[in-house]
Amino acid sequence: MTIAVGRAQERGWFDVLDDWLKRDRFVFIGWSGILLFPCAFLSIGGWFTGTTFVTSWYTHGLASSYLEGANFLTVAVSTPADSLGHSLLLLWGPEAQGDFTRWCQLGGLWNFTTLHGVFGLIGFMLRQFEIARLVGVRPYNAVAFSGPIAVYVSVFLMYPLGQSSWFFAPSWGVTSIFRFLLFAQGFHNLTLNPFHMMGVAGILGGALLCAIHGATVENTLFEDGQDANTFAAFTPTQAEETYSMVTANRFWSQIFGIAFSNKRWLHFFMLFVPVTGLWASAIGLVGIALNMRAYDFVSQEIRAAEDPEFETFYTKNILLNEGLRAWMAPQDQIHENFIFPEEVLPRGNAL
């Protein structure tokens, strides 16, 4: 018998770090966590700081913090001033020159929150890839999460990059998001944009599929327990099915005449519909960033202008958009000092 005697091979720092990052713990860290956790912490922390203390007086002429009297629905971390263009607004940059108070007044926290937020989302997507690899499953969760990332990037980065400055991006707050919705409708007629329509169909369709699927599974659970609560009869490791696909198929065949007969196709469809909708929405936002127009039904507009008795929901909406632009712009872009005389303000066709 031969016995080999020798020292164990020394492990490099990379292997030691790899083992520590992937150690089994309550909250998995992983390599993705190096990006995810700091960026998520700083982005969320920046939002709480801004909504608590920081005014929007110097950028939007608004009160936007709890300190000034706003509430949860009206606080916001506001976009920088229009005059700052697409500056990264670094704390040590030429605008703030290391002055934290000045940096907050200029809107630096919006850049801080948004840019750390996008890298946090990318880190979360990488986390799903990493854990899928370690557990040994396919990475469709990460693929699905590309939808929210695409919308985030298109709304908060691509849209303002296509416009004159970060000022026109949504500020981080509830009512400030509503302001962005009204702005996008008034200036881009977004609801008539086919990509926005596909996005609405995808999100509402996904919600409908989710509700139908959940209800159908609950309807066709096997009677395999004695309790009034059916949840207690299920264990995650059981080999048996917990509901009857055959019965579900029969039910929907009677309702619609057609039904899913393949669970894999059914669940892929539930993935496909909302994610495709989110991708389509992101494409639409890039379009309006470049000021591409939605559908224009010019013949209806010409006839409505000539005939006071002819009006469609389309021409009515065009007038509403004119109103949004005329009355919103002086409030929204106070730095432009817009003054519109009475004769240029929109009026209904019949007046």
Curated annotation (Swiss-Prot):
Q: Which residues bind chlorophyll a ChlzD2?
A: 116
GO MF term (any one) = chlorophyll binding
Keywords (alphabetical) are: Chlorophyll, Chromophore, Electron transport, Iron, Magnesium, Membrane, Metal-binding, Oxidoreductase, Photosynthesis, Photosystem II, Thylakoid, Transmembrane, Transmembrane helix, Transport
Cofactor binding, per record = The D1/D2 heterodimer binds P680, chlorophylls that are the primary electron donor of PSII, and subsequent electron acceptors. It shares a non-heme iron and each subunit binds pheophytin, quinone, additional chlorophylls, carotenoids and lipids. There is also a Cl(-1) ion associated with D1 and D2, which is required for oxygen evolution. The PSII complex binds additional chlorophylls, carotenoids and specific lipids.
Q: Where in the cell is it found?
A: Cellular thylakoid membrane
Can you supply a Gene Ontology BP term from the record? photosynthetic electron transport in photosystem II
Which domain of life does the UniProt lineage start with? Bacteria
Residues that, per the record, bind Fe cation: 213, 267
Give the free-text miscellaneous remark of the entry. Answer: 2 of the reaction center chlorophylls (ChlD1 and ChlD2) are entirely coordinated by water.
Function field? Photosystem II (PSII) is a light-driven water:plastoquinone oxidoreductase that uses light energy to abstract electrons from H(2)O, generating O(2) and a proton gradient subsequently used for ATP formation. It consists of a core antenna complex that captures photons, and an electron transfer chain that converts photonic excitation into a charge separation. The D1/D2 (PsbA/PsbD) reaction center heterodimer binds P680, the primary electron donor of PSII as well as several subsequent electron acceptors. D2 is needed for assembly of a stable PSII complex.
Looking up PANTHER family in the UniProt record yields:
PHOTOSYSTEM II D2 PROTEIN (PTHR33149:SF12), PHOTOSYSTEM II PROTEIN D1 (PTHR33149)
- The protein depicted here goes by the name Photosystem II D2 protein 1
Name the species this protein comes from. Answer: Acaryochloris marina (strain MBIC 11017)
